[in-house]
């Protein structure tokens, strides 16, 4: 699906039209919310904004971010890669969303106390973050291999009955990725590259960037806890790192043009296109229980959402821990991408939380 793009620098008219959005981002850089960013806006199939600000780090001689800079998009992997794989497998009749996870991954139920009801956890629960699995446990403190990470997730005690509570869970998506691999019979990363990214023309998106291009990717962190070195051009997430750089929850590197191409496929699904309308509608629908903002693999606007005030009901989006976000408004036919390395040099800063809604509000007010 083609997107109209205007080659060359952003016009002065566009910079003036979206001046408030630029101001939000410039102030964020000045406040050290992040050292630089790339961003884009797609409306009715046309790219109205595709630009960048700032640098890779806060050092004066650091490389400048350009509009096509590749970023570690962290948990955007869950939506753009893993959920897309689930969508296609569902469309092709290869995945029933109500399949029990234990039927795909027997290690998830073997040896468990029946009172946990792990046998009742389904693929749908994993997508909706309602499996009962905890949100996050640092398995990397004791796990040193992909097998150890997977085993830690498989054996992790449930903290709620399946479907009873919503809790965003990395571990659930690690298991989801492995469950999908049991269907595709190949590594999820390779399958997604071939079946999702190649058809959509997402030529920059990849896992495990080649060492030759790592210097062209903004660093995410000076890691003093786990790897004891600068993390640049390799996945920041510790569990994804132990999973050879690619997990169902993290590992993807992408850029603004590719994420806008992906968004266009979501915004204008057709029977003959990659994503069919009925599939998009299903995966964009909020899931129980009451109060859960998650659809299937996607978040939806709720309360003080990172999407801001103007994304309409039916919009879907996702955040990445590294400082990235993608929001898609299906009613108003638009998508907004913001890519940053807000975790540089250390991950404690939470200033991005106020930047995201302010940026999205400024974009929407300019339309």
What label would you give each PLM region?
Residues 1-18, 296:
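Short, compositionally biased leader-like segments
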Residues 11-73, 94, 111, 151, ...:
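Short, conserved catalytic-motif segment at the N-terminal edge
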Residues 19-26, 39, 45, 72-98, ...:
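Active-site SXXK
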Residues 96-113:
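Short, glycine/proline-biased beta-turn/loop segments that scaffold the active-site neighborhood
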Residues 268-271, 278-279, 284-286, 303, ...:
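Short, gly/Ser/Thr-rich active-site loops of penicillin-recognizing serine hydrolases
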Residues 314, 321-328:
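Short glycine-rich, acidic/polar surface loops and turns
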